[in-house]
Regions:
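GIY-YIG nuclease catalytic motif and its immediate N-terminal context
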Residues: 1, 138-264, 269-346
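Peripheral peptide segments
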Residues: 1-141
Length: 346
């Protein structure tokens, strides 16, 4: 199993006394880099110090007046070789995934020694780096607020009663063993387009064994089949809703097998998912709010699926990447502060 490691470059603005590395550097850029790095929930975070090389966050170091920006190429190469030597003792340079929150001079001779890496701030000036990091950190706080709020609402699960569900609104799904923001992790957000159809929509997911009426059911079935490398996955993809498609494809499908998969999907959903609901009467407002909630959660680096999350068996890259049982409305416009305030007042 590979590890996720983040490397943050040091800065000139420091405290004037010996302390832990994560506290020594006091510039806004370093502080936001560190907050962002921690939000990613990596396995390890290190500081790239111009004087001390590779430094752990809790390592106590003295302040110093040294930067790679004033070093010659030969000095930078020597420094980089020392960092690589240290790094190779605490990480697998060929298998681990590295994220650089560091300038060009700090990373240029490290990158050739590493196979897997990301540079999210590449090409950005200091001002734009701060803007990027502030947005990331702010979105994580919004996502945390959403999780705290939705985790506080009355939780429903199968079997559920119509009287506990509004006719029009939005549902928020949670999945067993999935955690985020000190609570249950949100794994799906959904609504309906037809008038008074929220109850019906939830029944299509939880009860009615017809994957062509529920993309959520179809995605759960895809995971079962893909995990088993079952060739029936190709037939599972066929949609028999339209009359012409039913006439064309029915003879291709083993309906006894399909029924067994539908039953398996029902059991998995009923046993593993719970949800909360809240009313939104206006269709346009429902759809807009659904989209913004999805985007807010998909943009949050703290909302990571567990290592054994069932969704990792999906053939859909967007599901595996986002950690959500969704492929639409990901990474778009998140909720504003005003949106969150209004949401809590519904």
């Amino acid at each position: 199993m590979s590890s996720r490691i983040i490397l943050i470059s040091c800065v000139s603005k420091k405290l004037n006394y010996k302390t832990e590395a994560e506290k020594l550097y006091i510039s806004p850029l370093f502080k936001y880099n560190l907050r962002y790095a921690k939000s990613l929930k990596p396995d390890k975070i290190f500081v790239l110090s111009a004087k001390y090389g590779l430094v752990g966050l809790k390592q106590r170091i003295e302040p110093y007046d040294l930067t790679l920006n004033k070093m010659s190429l030969a000095e930078i190469k020597k420094w980089s070789n020392q960092v690589v030597k240290k790094l190779s003792k605490v990480a697998n340079l060929k298998k681990d995934e590295f994220t650089f929150l560091a300038g060009q001079k700090y990373r240029q001779y490290l990158i050739p020694e590493i196979n897997n890496y990301k540079i999210p701030l590449k090409g950005l000036g200091i001002g734009k780096q701060l803007g990027y990091l502030k947005n990331k950190v702010a979105n994580e706080e919004k996502c945390s607020q959403l999780h705290r709020y939705f985790n506080s609402l009355k939780r429903l699960k199968f079997p559920f009663l119509d009287k506990n569900i509004p006719k029009n609104g939005i549902y928020i799904l949670f999945e067993k063993k999935e955690l985020a923001h000190e609570g249950n992790r949100i794994v799906r957000i959904g609504t309906h387009t037809g008038l008074n159809q929220l109850r019906s929509r939830l029944k299509q997911h939880f009860i009615q064994e017809n994957k062509d009426r529920s993309i959520f059911r179809k995605n759960i079935g895809r995971c079962f089949l893909n995990k088993q490398k079952d060739s029936f996955l190709e037939k599972w993809e066929l949609d028999l809703t339209a009359k012409k498609d039913k006439e064309k494809n029915s003879q291709l499908i083993d309906f006894k097998k399909q029924k067994k998969i539908e039953q398996k999907v029902s059991k998995y959903i009923q046993d593993n998912f719970s949800f909360v609901v809240f009313p939104i009467e206006d269709k346009k407002k429902r759809l807009a709010l659904e989209s913004k909630i999805i985007s807010t959660i998909s943009l949050c680096n703290e909302c990571k699926p567990s290592k054994n999350w069932f969704g990792f068996n999906s053939p859909k890259g967007k599901i595996k990447e986002s950690g959500l049982w969704l492929v639409n409305e990901l990474y778009k416009e998140p909720l504003s502060d005003k949106d969150i305030k209004e949401l809590k007042n519904i």
